[in-house]
């Protein structure tokens, strides 16, 4: 007779799950022993449970199916929380198995006791306690169903002793748990209202988010009919940037002036599958149509004139026959011309200054992009690495870009890379890591060596919390508390038995990355980059300009004029502040 843990593994395998990320603990012994006995199911051990949740999120994003992580009772599953928040806000299906103290001890302030159902409620679509062995199969299936249908995190809390209980055969879990296919589009009245607005507008701009996944061709046809430039949010980049003659770049804090301008000049803004959060980048006077699969998102970020509930693919397909071709393509042509100028200016910043040190981070990202494989998976840390990835890593329909783009947590690049590489050890995975982010979960470099994961880690080593410093400058504050006294990360990698290099001169960068990418195991390339590089947003507000002026004055008064000189030398001399 199988145990509860045996049933869990069998159901997961039947539903296409191949591994669980986690760290062993006594309350998980029944589960890990079942994995050992199964023989054909993976246990991906990491060095911190937070990494287990990040890795599961990356696997779910990459495979498009359920991924699983586990944590032992108390502190073990508490460590999962940050990674689970990331998965929940990225809308990827993750099952978290949170082991619990013995059921008889609940409520007694027992060793390592917490209240997992309360703790995980905010970062999940489903969170329930298994109170009896007989209840386990049903709760497991309900949790898996919630995760795959709602694209979110489901948490099953299991007292450790329940894993080892024998279980009679049950119909629960007898069939694979996979997402159901469906068609979702607005009704005819909504479609006709949208068509009327679009047909009467002169200047239409499309803002595309992650919801355009799987709808690339439909959106291209729509843009052609409407003569509409396409601006993308960061999460839409990998799905819409490639093979796109209507692309005018990103908007937002990380975006391009051309994307910002195309939105500001629109009569109608058509939002497709995006929950873009920054209100200051929306147009003041345009009519706005929003298409989203989640009704709660409609009108959440900016007032809208029309909300349409449906998938982007289904909605656009139904809308196209109602639209008239636009003969006036001047808005599109102006936007594309501006984009070409913006793109040329950005590319000029990524040129190789062979004698200038520290190295420009733009150049690092551009070289990594050029040398990486056509189907590479890029994972990026929150902070300045996201800026450089957004601007210089190009998508082609085969590459992937994974990061904490909604939750915004540091230290995600390496754990996400672990999850991505675990799915396919032959696919190139490149982690663009900040020095601060890498240091937070530095022990996971050991996971790369122990699990034989050939992840390539590129460290943007500017010896600071760089993006935090930029925010301080914009607020008119003298940098404080952002200094990082870093080691030679390449030497540390070598000491751990990995390929390690440190690059301090631009002339050495390409050779180091080429060697690292060709290496058959994990590799770390520590690149010393310019600390004072400014990732200027597409539009600077009066308040931000005032902030930079105050920063300059206060920096001089604080006796740190050398910092200001570096800032001016690196940025003003290169004409990116005008």
Task: Cite the ranges covered by each PLM segment.
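N-terminal alpha/beta PP-like core and its mobile active-site loop of ThDP/TPP-dependent enzymes
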Residues: 1-329, 367, 371-374, 454-457, ...
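Active-site diphosphate/adenylate-binding microenvironment
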Residues: 5-15, 26, 31-36, 340-415, ...
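Active-site nucleophile and cofactor-binding loops and adjacent substrate-binding regions
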Residues: 23-25, 44-54, 69-75, 131-133, ...
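Glycine/charged-rich beta-loop-alpha catalytic/anionic-binding loops adjacent to active sites
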Residues: 36-43, 61-68, 391-406, 473-476
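A general structural motif
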Residues: 48, 108-109, 181-193, 252-255, ...
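Thiamine diphosphate
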Residues: 112, 450-543
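Phosphate/pyrophosphate-binding active-site segments
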Residues: 134, 157, 169-170, 181, ...
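Catalytic phosphate/nucleotide-handling subdomain of diverse soluble enzymes
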Residues: 416-456
